[in-house]
């Protein structure tokens, strides 16, 4: 079973995000949406979906960009699945995302972390570019070298983690503004058995004018 967590704040693309998850060909999952005390009307968007797999919670106080890791780990705290995915509220999944990861996990059950290629899309969902292909299996040191030298474009929703690994390591690595928190969490997960990669673009990662980037910084474009 997969648990997909959306730390939600922006309304603009949330419907599309949720719809892409509920349209998965692999059906054994739960969708956790944690509204980070958004000033936008997320309740109405979520209420349009009548699906018992949705768990919806609203924070009393906004974590904000500086403490965004708190909301990432809040999503994780609700999860009951064996594998966990953290989803950007403006990204979308290919309908075969979970099915492809499920098949790959069966081949490499010892691994703590899995990854896929991504389409980078614009505000109108047009594809701008495709991220690089990787080896099917890569060690921690190889991945770090390629990442630090600019040969690995990766985000957050393109990773699938073994939930027990995240729980045992106190969730996603804490840094203010989530600076490199996603990368450090992935490196920790790769330590023992590397990372397993699917060379198919299963995530649509949206480049928008204001977003929290994959390195945790606030991008203004």
Predicted regions and their residues:
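Acidic donor-binding segment of Leloir-type glycosyltransferases
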Residues: 20-61
């Amino acid at each position: 079973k997969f648990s997909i967590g959306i730390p939600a704040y922006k309304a603009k693309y949330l419907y599309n995000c949720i719809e892409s998850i509920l349209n998965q060909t692999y059906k054994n999952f739960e969708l956790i949406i944690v509204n980070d005390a958004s000033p936008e009307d997320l309740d109405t968007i979520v209420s349009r979906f009548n699906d018992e797999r949705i768990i919806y919670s609203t924070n009393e106080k906004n974590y904000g960009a500086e403490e965004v890791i708190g909301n990432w780990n809040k999503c994780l705290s609700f999860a009951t699945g064996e594998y966990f995915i953290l989803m950007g509220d403006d990204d979308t999944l290919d309908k075969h995302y979970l099915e492809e990861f499920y098949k790959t996990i069966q081949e490499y059950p010892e691994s703590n972390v899995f990854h896929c290629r991504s389409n980078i899309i614009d505000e109108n969902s047009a594809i701008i570019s495709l991220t690089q292909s990787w080896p099917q299996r890569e060690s921690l040191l190889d991945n770090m070298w390629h990442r630090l030298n600019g040969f690995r474009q990766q985000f957050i929703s393109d990773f699938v983690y073994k939930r027990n690994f995240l729980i045992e390591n106190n969730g996603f690595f804490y840094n203010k503004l989530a600076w490199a928190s996603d990368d450090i969490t992935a490196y920790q997960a790769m330590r023992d058995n590397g990372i397993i990669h699917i060379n198919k673009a299963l995530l649509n990662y949206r480049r928008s004018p204001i977003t929290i980037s994959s390195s945790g910084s606030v991008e203004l474009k």
